[in-house]
Structures are given as structure tokens and as C-alpha cells.
Amino acid sequence: GLDQTRGWFYTLTVLAAHLFDKPAFENCVVNGIVLASDGRKMSKSLRNYTDPVEAIDKFGADAIRLFLMYSTVVKADEIRYSDEGVRDILKSILIPLWNSYSFFVTYANIDKVSPTGKLFDNALPSNPLDAWLLSISQKLIKDVSAALDAYDLNSAIDPIVKFIDQLNNWYIRRSRRRFWKSENDTDKTEAYEALYIALKTLCKVAAPFIPFITEEMYLNLKTSEDKESVHLCDYPVPNENWLNEELEFKMATVQKAVSMGHSLRNTFNLKNRQPLASVALVTRNIEEKRVLSEMEDCIREELNVKKVIFHEREDELVEYKAKANFKVLGKELGPLMKKAAGIIAELTSEQIVAILEGNKLSVQIEGKSVELDSEKVLVEPIATNYGVGIAVRFW
């Protein structure tokens, strides 16, 4: 624990410096203390903890291991152990991981396909979705390796969690029909190959953190040329030929628009199965607009809208009302506050949007110059066209 900073770690440092004139170690990973769910130390007499054997039988060793490694306890901080926390890890990370593997195995067995992972050695996939999956799988290797090289165990798991989410909630969901097709055409073959490579890469990258599940997956995915265990494999090195930052930017841009669109639907209780006339995307970034235009079909399908409309100004869709922030301006203006409130209430939509974008607006109040910003002015929308569509501000 952290108490060893002045104990064993200190002793080693002093001895090494005195006897050998060099550091005892270059890096030191220190764990914190795992407390019971009530915040007290785990105690046999209090029985304030779950029996480890019962916890492993209930959740599996991987879930408990990942719960601890994906916490601040690996940064020498205290952590409260709870069955609920382990259950959350199981539901949000490990089950989705297994579901993606199960999806692949189920359909690969039905179609009697046996990917090798070599299809894209000399040529990239023709489908952008497959090329994107290969790219983010290589980025996964780079990000996790960088965190491990920095001895940052907690941060090393973040890219794995994100990748599992991307794999399930974007790639597989958007590719299902390709696997469902009856004919084994080139597109279907490439989809199997891309998913196979992604799963096998994920097994190798995540093996130090999720040793048992990744081993089970690997044993069924490996070919006759592979090592007999994932834990005997070299840690993967990214294939630079598969990395495509531009494609990742495009997909991230579309995902951002889709995510905000879904959020707006939830806000106004509009189920995704309910078709809408349009979605309005507000962006001033030329590159983002180009990407969104190219991926318009994907956006329409994801948000279940008939049309995608682009705007450069949010005030083309929404009208605003401005009010003075009396708490902030009152101290500055005193008796001029009432006059200022009237002037702020008369601000135009263009002036309000300028303030929302971080600009300052100078106004005269009885000869005194006052600069208005987002802290001094409270803004709220008073009208929007949500009846036939949804509007997404993209900056």
C-alpha cells in the first residue's frame, strides 16, 4: 500500500543509492486499500465483505479483476468494494464483449466460414465500415500500449471499454444485414474478416486485464498457425497501413451528430421508431459539413428521418430570449440594474447568439459602458421547430 512509500520503497531507494549509486527502480506501481462497502476496513469479525469464493462463483474472476484495475485503487487511492460495482462491470463491459464474440461465432458457424485474418494484408476493405473497424483496432493497440508503457493501468482500460462499445453499438449494429444475407458475396466475406481481426486483436490487447474470457475467445478464434494460448502471444503491434485518421474523424463526426439526435429524441420523448420529417444539423465547420453530407444516408437511417437539412446559424431554427443575471450584474451596476435589465431584454437574436458563442457585447447604460457576456446574460430558447423534426447544434 501507499504506507510503503516511507517503508519498503524508501528503504530500497536508500540502500541502492548508498551501496550502488543508482536507483533501485525506475517505476513503482502502488495499490491503495480495498475497503468494505461501508467504508471500513474489511474485517472477519464484522463480516462486512462478500466471501471471495462466492464473489468469483457469482461474477467470475475477470469481473472482479477488472473492477479493481478499472478504479483508482491502482493509483494508490482507497476504494470501496461492492457487489453492485462488480455487477456493473459485468453488465457494461464483459457481457457486451461476449455478445460481440457470440454474434461472430453464431453466424460464422451458420455460413461455415473460417476467416484467417490475412485477407487485408495486401488490399484494404472496400466497405468504409470495415476499414474504420481495422483502423480503430490498430488505434486500440497504440492507446493501450502507450498507457501500459507509462504504467497507467487505469487509463489503459479506457480504450478497451470504448472499443467494445464501438464494436457492438456501431459496427455490428450497422453491419447486421451484411451477415444476414443468404449469399456469400465479397462484401459478406470482408465483413467476417474485419470482425474476426477486430475480435482477435481485442483478445490480445485485453488479455492482461481480462485473462479468462479473452483466453476462451482466443481458443475458438485461433488458427493452426497461432500460439496455443493468448497468453503466449506477443503483445500486438499496430499495422500502420490500416490506420486511417481521416476515416476515424469522419465516423466520429457522424456518431456525434447521431448521438445528439438521439439525445434530443429522448428529451422530447420521441421514440426512434417514430419517423420524423427532418433533422437540422447546425455547423459552421466546412469539413464537418462535407463529412455529414457524405454520410447523409447513414444519419437518416440512424435517426429515422426523411431529410437532413444543414444550417450555419442556430438562430435560423431557434428564437432566444435574454434576461439579466441579477446576481452577477447587480454587484457591478447597483442602481443601474433595472435599466440594464430592460436593455438586455431587447437584445436581438444575432446579439444573443454572439454571446452564446463566447463573444462580448458592449452596451451603454446611462453613459456607462458595460460588457455583456454569457455570465451576465441568461439565455433561453422560446421557439423551435420540434413538431416536424429535430435540431442539432454542432459546435
Label each region the model flagged.
Residues F67-Y70:
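Structured mid-domain segments that build the active-site/substrate or prosthetic-cofactor binding neighborhood
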Residues T11-H18:
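Short Ser/Thr-interspersed hydrophobic loop/turn segments at strand-loop and sheet-helix junctions
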Residues V74-A76:
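Transmembrane helix-loop junctions at the membrane interface of multipass transporters and ion channels
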Residues L19-D57, A61, R80-Y81, G85-W395:
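Feature 926 captures the class I aminoacyl-tRNA synthetase adenylation module centered on the KMSKS loop
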Residues G1-W8:
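N-terminal catalytic cores of NTP/NDP-binding nucleotidyl/phosphoryl-transfer enzymes
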